[in-house]
């Protein structure tokens, strides 16, 4: 089920190069660290039923540290796995089970709610993963291939306007925009008519490519308010960049829940900065689109998350005909519960794909 991203450039030993004692102690250290988030001392290992003295365990842990698999924080005599050590553990020791039946039913029920727009369903999938996995849920929306059928601007009051785009395949995308109070119904209708005349039948990518020159025409032909609606609507639907896809992130607050020390707070702040890099994140998840099953990125294996030391677990979601639509996953600290999160991501991606078919 799991296809893994290659390890870091710096060479680390393989499992075959570790003797049985080293493998056993290494596994116990990593499992304890993933459970508690705390460095693991030799006495903790000896209490777990290992028939070795604490001194022998310390010597083995020192050997593992010299191999680049374990490290010691400055404030503790205990050891914790390096990112290379976590990679070895995930590839060689991790036992991945199945999602609990109760959680399967909960995922299916929350994604089966009728009346949602396409993007609202994707946002719900991101929220589901965030809540179950304890990290931030991420989804990259598909590239829209269907043409636009209808565009409308709906006033909501309080300086807010809902931009509604209906596609030929029946999907609907909504964007909430802020406008100066007092936008008139005539300006909303004028902007809608202008876009409908030019966007009908075009994909979002085509619209963004071809509408750049039309904005000047909009400014000449429409009043100032209607022209601004046209410009803001196009920017909102296309994400404001050259890529017509959107990145949906939910559950960032979960990333703060596990922060214990100043170093953890700094790491989370860096991760928040990383999550603002939409283009790089979509580029990373594009690699996931080409994978079979779940991909795992740990810390420095990606340039984007090397400073925050975060991990990404993601999978493509696709139609029953194996057409890849996008990618969905979880971002969190390197000590994510991989055995739990991997099957959650895999199952949610498959349910989401079935829902897109329906």
Curated annotation (Swiss-Prot):
Q: Which organism is it from?
A: Caulobacter vibrioides (strain NA1000 / CB15N) (Caulobacter crescentus)
Q: Which GO terms describe its molecular function?
A: DNA binding
Coiled-coil stretches are none
Q: What is this protein called?
A: Heat-inducible transcription repressor HrcA
TM spans (from-to) = none
Keyword entries, A-Z? Repressor, Stress response, Transcription, Transcription regulation
InterPro entries cross-referenced by the UniProt entry:
GAF-like_dom_sf, HrcA, HrcA_C, WH-like_DNA-bd_sf, WH_DNA-bd_sf, WHTH_transcript_rep_HrcA_IDD
- Give the record's family classification: Belongs to the HrcA family.
């Amino acid at each position: 089920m799991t296809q893994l991203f290659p390890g870091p450039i710096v060479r680390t030993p393989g499992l075959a190069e570790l003797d049985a004692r080293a493998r056993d102690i290494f596994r116990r250290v990593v499992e304890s660290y993933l459970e508690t988030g705390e460095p693991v001392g030799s006495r903790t290992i000896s209490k777990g039923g290992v028939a070795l003295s604490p001194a022998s365990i310390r010597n083995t842990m020192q050997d593992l540290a010299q191999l680049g698999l374990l490290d010691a924080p400055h404030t503790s005599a205990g050891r914790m796995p390096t990112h290379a050590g976590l990679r070895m553990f995930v590839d060689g020791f991790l036992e991945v089970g199945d999602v609990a039946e109760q959680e399967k039913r909960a995922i299916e029920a929350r994604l089966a709610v009728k009346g949602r727009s396409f993007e609202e369903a994707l946002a719900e999938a991101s929220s589901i993963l965030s809540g179950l996995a304890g990290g931030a849920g991420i989804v990259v929306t598909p590239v829209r291939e269907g043409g636009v059928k209808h565009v409308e601007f709906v006033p909501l009051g309080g300086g807010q306007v809902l931009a509604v785009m209906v596609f030929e395949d029946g999907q609907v995308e909504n964007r909430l925009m802020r406008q100066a109070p007092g936008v008139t119904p005539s300006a909303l209708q004028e902007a809608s008519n202008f876009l409908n005349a030019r966007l009908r039948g075009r994909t979002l990518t085509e619209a963004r490519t071809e509408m750049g020159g039309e904005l000047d025409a909009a400014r000449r032909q429409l009043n100032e308010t209607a022209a601004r609606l046209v410009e803001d609507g196009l920017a909102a639907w296309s994400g404001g960049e050259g890529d017509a896809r959107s990145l949906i992130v939910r559950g960032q607050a979960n990333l703060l829940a596990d922060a214990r020390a100043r170093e953890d707070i700094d790491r989370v702040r860096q991760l928040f900065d990383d999550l603002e890099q939409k283009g790089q994140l979509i580029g990373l998840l594009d690699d996931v689109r080409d994978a079979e099953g779940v991909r795992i990125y740990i810390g420095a294996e990606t340039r984007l998350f090397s400073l925050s030391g975060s991990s990404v677990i993601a999978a493509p979601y696709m139609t029953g005909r194996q057409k890849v639509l996008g990618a969905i996953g979880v971002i969190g600290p390197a000590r994510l519960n991989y055995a739990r999160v991997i099957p959650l991501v895999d199952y949610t991606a498959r349910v989401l794909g079935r829902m897109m078919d329906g």
